[in-house]
Amino acid sequence: MRFVMPGDRIGSAEEYVKGEGVYEEGGELFAAVAGKLIIKDRVAKVESISPIPEIVKGDVVLGRVVDLRNSIALIEVSSKKGENRGPSNRGIGILHVSNVDEGYVKEISEAVGYLDILKARVIGDNLRLSTKEEEMGVLRALCSNCKTEMVREGDILKCPECGRVEKRKISTDYGKGEW
């Protein structure tokens, strides 16, 4: 066994079969993560020195709203709570209007806005998300008019620059810089 760093050449694709932690480029195999190189039965894999976290049902994640439709928001998931490094299965999560709040929400745009940063719980496969819990919801929002960061005033958000008032599903951690 030897220690390898990301990008280190392991061998050719003719010599070994690509395993976990290894990628192939131009017929050559390279380490995708830092760790111990293990070759067994002609399968080359790299065992990471610090495992890459995976997002599973029940986890709390941080993400940014990248698209809004009538009944869903697409959330670019970037972090998993309690982990110092990004998860391996980060991607686009789906927040359906029925999973926003305990009360009735007609359209998703009543609860989240484009580029909002939010905290959500994973409730199913394919990164299905929910913000129904009190501490889940928008952590940071930009004014849809002038893009200034909104300030919380009770149950609403107000733009300190242009005075615009907007409604969101606000997290209890809004504006605290923590999640």
UniProtKB/Swiss-Prot annotation:
InterPro entries documented for this protein: Csl4, EXOSC1_C, Exosome_cplx_N_dom, Exosome_Csl4_arc, NA-bd_OB-fold, S1_domain
Gene Ontology annotations for the cellular component aspect, listed alphabetically: cytoplasm; exosome (RNase complex)
UniProt binding sites for Zn(2+): C143, C146, C159, C162
Keyword Metal-binding assigned: yes
Domain S1 motif: 58-137
Keywords for the protein's UniProt record, in alphabetical order: Cytoplasm, Exosome, Metal-binding, Zinc
Subcellular location: Cytoplasm
GO molecular function: RNA binding; zinc ion binding
Gene Ontology biological-process annotations: RNA catabolic process; RNA processing
Note on domains (UniProt): Contains an N-terminal domain that mediates interactions with the hexameric ring, a central S1 domain and a C-terminal zinc-ribbon domain.
Protein's job: Non-catalytic component of the exosome, which is a complex involved in RNA degradation. Increases the RNA binding and the efficiency of RNA degradation. Helpful for the interaction of the exosome with A-poor RNAs.
Similarity comment: Belongs to the CSL4 family.
Subunit text: Component of the archaeal exosome complex. Forms a trimer of Rrp4 and/or Csl4 subunits. The trimer associates with a hexameric ring-like arrangement composed of 3 Rrp41-Rrp42 heterodimers. Interacts with DnaG.
Record's miscellaneous remark: The zinc ion has probably a structural role.
NCBIfam families associated with the record: PRK09521.1
Name of protein: Exosome complex component Csl4
Organism: Archaeoglobus fulgidus (strain ATCC 49558 / DSM 4304 / JCM 9628 / NBRC 100126 / VC-16)
